[in-house]
Each structure stands twice: as structure tokens, then as C-alpha cells.
């Protein structure tokens, strides 16, 4: 019998953290955070990081796990996540994944193979230069002979993906498309229960706007100033996150603070929209509408689904 694994997904500000902690209390569980920003140390307010008080005694993994300037990929998350899952199960606890980064969730629940550990920076730079000089179509055509499947599946303008496909072939002598071919993508060693919280779009957007205002009240500006003083600037991946890059624009004198706040709100709303699009594409997701169901009804449904099966 497969080990059961619970996933709580959904857009930003929908209430995933609160639900996952209540579920962990009821199921004797521990939580893996699948959030691309909460994994970084010192980035607390802008990432709406769960606090020690909010954790309510529930152990969380992959929060404050790496320095802000540490290069971090989905493959890295998969490795850390698998180690966390093993610890949770060995501790006799129920594993719960909670977060809004769909790709991170998939890395632990789908049949995904990564070759991210293998990189050739000089070849990447060569291809980037080639694309700038001769156009995206030129490097896209290079794919035709070595990986015709990726050539058809990856659009010429998705330069990053085209470069990655060419790089994988150069490093492994195997086409990028050969990874996962013939395998059921959703095949997992776990019995996955995947729930996604939703609510009326206008209501969600209002929650997002209010949360950004609360972040400013809690000291997001000072958090960004402190990060900048620690040497973390816009040239690193983590500082390109929503809430950080906009405040950096303000600190660099490029925009007003009011404009930065508006941009954070707009960026967060756009991100929520993309998150929902991602989850709707996943055939495993069971959507729980918070406009129709109360928090207690959602809690009861998830617990009953897991217990009765």
C-alpha cells in the first residue's frame, strides 16, 4: 500500500497556511513548504512567511532553508523535499505539502526527472550570444537535428527553454525530450490527495491588496533596506521576487513608494491568476471553493477523504 501524501495548493493569500496547520494538528502531520520565496532566510515579511506562533507547534520543512544569494532550482527543491518526506515518514508523522509553487509540488508528486545538476555555463553564454546576434529562430533550428520532439514542443521565443534543451543534449548526448518519455507523468510512489483552495476572484484580489498594505505596516520597506545592507541586490534571484524587486526600484530612486506598492499589488494579483491557471491544468486537483464551503467544512472534507480511504 502506498504512503498517503496530502497537498494543499492554491493562489497567494487564499488561506493555505491556516488550513494546512489545522490539518497537521488533526492528522498528526508535519508540513513541507512548497513556496519559492519562504525557503530564503531573512525574507520574512515580503514572502508572508509563516511565523513560529502561527506554526502552533507543527514542524515545518523548507522554510528559512537557504541564504538569499544561494542559486536554487526545482531540482534542488526536489532533493531537499524528498529528504524532508523521508524524515516525516520515519518520524511516524503524516506528510503534508502546502504552497503555491506548482512546479515545486510536482517535483515531489510527479514522475519528473531533472538534469539540473549538470550545467555548462560557457555553452549557455555562447547560445545566448548567438540568439542575440542571429535571433531566437536560429538557435531553435539547432534543436531540429538533435531533438526534433523538443523542436516541435518548445516555441522559438522560449529562448531559456531552447537553450536548456541544447545544453542537456550537449552534456548527456540524450535529447531533452527523452526524459519522462514513456512514463506516466502523474505516476507517483505516493497516494496523493491534492486539494486547491479557491474563492471569488474579486474577493481574492481584495485579500491580496489588504495583505500588501499589512506587509508595509509590518515593515517590508525596512526588511528590504536591511537585505540591501547585507549585500543582497537586484542581481540575485531571490530579490527578483514580488515585493522585493519593486521596493528595490524605490530604494534606487526609480519609482515612488506609492508606485512600488501599486506594482506589488498588481504583480501579486497577476501571480495569483497564473497560479490558478497552473492548478486548473492538473487533473489531480480537487477544488475547494471557500465561497461555498466554510473553513470547518473544508477541514472535515479533507480529513474524511483521507481517513475513509
Swiss-Prot record:
The enzyme class is transferase
Q: Which cofactor does it need?
A: Mg(2+)
Membrane spanning residue stretches = none
Q: Where is this region: Interaction with substrate tRNA?
A: 35-38
Q: Which GO terms describe its molecular function?
A: ATP binding; tRNA dimethylallyltransferase activity
Q: Which residues does ATP bind?
A: 10-17
GO biological process assignments: tRNA modification
What keywords appear on the UniProt entry?
ATP-binding, Magnesium, Nucleotide-binding, Transferase, tRNA processing
- Which reaction is the catalytic activity of this chain? adenosine(37) in tRNA + dimethylallyl diphosphate = N(6)-dimethylallyladenosine(37) in tRNA + diphosphate
In this chain, substrate is annotated as bound at 12-17
Q: What is its EC number?
A: 2.5.1.75
Sites annotated Interaction with substrate tRNA: 101, 124
Cysteine pairings via disulfide bonds: none
**Pfam families hit by this protein:** IPPT
- Cross-referenced HAMAP family, in alphabetical order? IPP_trans
Function, as annotated, reads: Catalyzes the transfer of a dimethylallyl group onto the adenine at position 37 in tRNAs that read codons beginning with uridine, leading to the formation of N6-(dimethylallyl)adenosine (i(6)A).
Question: Quaternary structure?
Answer: Monomer.
User: Would you identify the family this protein belongs to, as annotated?
Assistant: Belongs to the IPP transferase family.
- Name it: tRNA dimethylallyltransferase
- Natural source organism: Clostridium beijerinckii (strain ATCC 51743 / NCIMB 8052)
Tell me the classification of the organism that encodes this protein.
Bacteria, Bacillati, Bacillota, Clostridia, Eubacteriales
